[in-house]
Amino acid sequence: NELQARGWHRGGVLVPAVQGMQLIPGPGADAVHKSFAVSLPAEAPLAVQAHYLALALGVLRHHYPEEKLILAGHSAGGVVARFVLLGNNPYQVSQLITIASPHLGTGRAAQGLDVVDAKPFFCPGPGIEFLKHLVGGADYDYLEDSRGVLVDLLPAGSGNVLSWLNQQPHPAIAYYAVVRNTPLAAGDNIVPGFSQDLNNVPTLQGKVTVLYTPSGHVLNPQDGVLLAGILDNS
């Protein structure tokens, strides 16, 4: 709503389909400034989500071959977005904005795995709350299905795909990292501040503009205002 109010019209949504990803046009599909939402299988491993995102970007490039393409991702979505930049930026993304994303992983993933591996009768505590916020879902069956993405989001250095991603060369585009800032410390109750800061990724050190926002992990209207400001200056 905040993007819409500031002139960024809803261009549509891309959803999984038999053929790959399907674009469902919105009222702003032909507007000069438009945004698109992408529906991804949030419980899937990061590489699988990145595959679907790549298909979505291919669809957008088919419809809009010459327009500037800016990616914005919240939480794990910001990490997924980095995957599609690899290999010489095949979709010609000009800018990446991540919001509260666990670029160096999060200990909450280990807590989620503890819930899965313990096979409890119920899911109290931070493990299930982590899943609700990071990938979505509210019960044990969903948590169990999300084991792959939890392994991917273990703290960097675990030998997982995130560790691999952070060693890959990234294209020379504009990078923004929105880092949550609570009264006690940088970060939030899901992802620590140092993990949200893209400058801590070895191949991106010193190349990222970091913006701090006094907020919890979930998206809020102020994020839309912040995004619109970045987009207007792009």
Model-predicted segments: where are they?
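Short, conserved active-site loop motifs that form the nucleotide-linked donor/cofactor pocket
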Residues: 33-35, 69, 175, 207-208
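Gly/Ala-rich beta-loop-alpha elbow adjacent to hydrolase catalytic centers
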Residues: 72-77, 81
